[in-house]
Every structure is written in C-alpha cells, then in structure tokens.
Amino acid sequence: MNFQNTIFFLVLLYNVQTAIETPCTLREQKIRKILRGNSKNMLSFRSGGLLTTARTNYYQPDFYSSIPTRDTIYIVNFSFGFTYSALDQSLIFRTMQSYEINTVFLSLWDYTYRTYNFQVFISFNGTEKLIFDSLAATGSMYIKFADQQVDTIRYYNRGGSTDNFALILIKVEAFYKR
C-alpha cells in the first residue's frame, strides 16, 4: 500500500509539473515579456522614444546631450544637459508602440535647492490617467503604478519650481519592473 501511494504521488507530481510548463503557458510568458519591452526602458532614444513636444520645449545648445531620453552618460551643468518646459506646458513622450509598464523614473534638476509642482500622466489610445501629483517634488524618483498598457507619458508643469517657472528634466525612463 505504501509503495502504491508513493507511485501515485510521483505520477501526480509529474502531471502537475508538466501542466505548469505547457507550451501555452510558455508562449503566454514570451508574449507578456515582449509586451513589457523585455523590461527595458521604453523611452530610450534607441528604443524609439520620441519627445513629441520638442518644438515647444527648450534645450540648451546641443540637442542630443540635452534630450532626457538619451542613453549615454551625461554631463549636466548650468549650460546644457537638460530639457525644460514653461509654466502650464507639458513634456510629452510617445513610443513607437505600446508597452505594458508599471514604473516611471525621472530625474529633476536639483543643483540648487528647489521643489517642483507638476503632474505625470500615462495614456493608451488617448485615454489619460494621472499617476503622480506633487506640489513639492525634488531630485530623482521612481513612480510605481499598476501594470498598464502605455503609449504616451506626459509631464505637466503645473506650477514651476520654487526657483523659477520651469519644469527641468534631466533623465526620464519607463519600464516594467517585477
């Protein structure tokens, strides 16, 4: 009887293990990984992240070293290395395709003590959702939210900073984080 129970348990364990690793489950995991952009930065310059409001935003002399989606190591000082938007304007980033993400990273200008009054929105097919609202944000931050399909991220400069009118971004990223 004990031997039969052992055999039954082993057969049951084998069937459960086989069912877990079925081709359907593996295919679903592969598709989900692709939809999540392989957990890479969807706003990366090389991934095709576009600043759609580039004509209305401000850059210092060299465009490439000032765009916040750049992949290279960057130097930031009072002359270059950042992008900013005026009061009541937005920095809008659009991707080549939609991705499922749950984390947005941004680095704000913080070489002088200042806090920013801004909002962050994500959208998919024109439906926008507020994911961050702050009257006193500073430095670099990760914004976590529920898994969602996203094709556009908008940083709205609601009130500028305590130092001036601008929302100054040094770096932006968006990705799926487990």
Describe the predicted segments one by one.
Residues 8, 55-56, 155, 160:
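Intrinsically disordered, low-complexity repeat segments enriched in small/polar residues
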Residues 22-37, 44, 85-88, 110-178:
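Trp- and acidic/polar-enriched beta-sheet ligand-binding modules for extracellular glycan
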Residues 3, 14-96, 109-114, 177-178:
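Disordered, acidic Ser/Thr/Pro-rich linker "stalks" and the adjacent N-terminal cap
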Residues 1-9:
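Classical eukaryotic N-terminal signal peptides for Sec-dependent ER targeting/secretion
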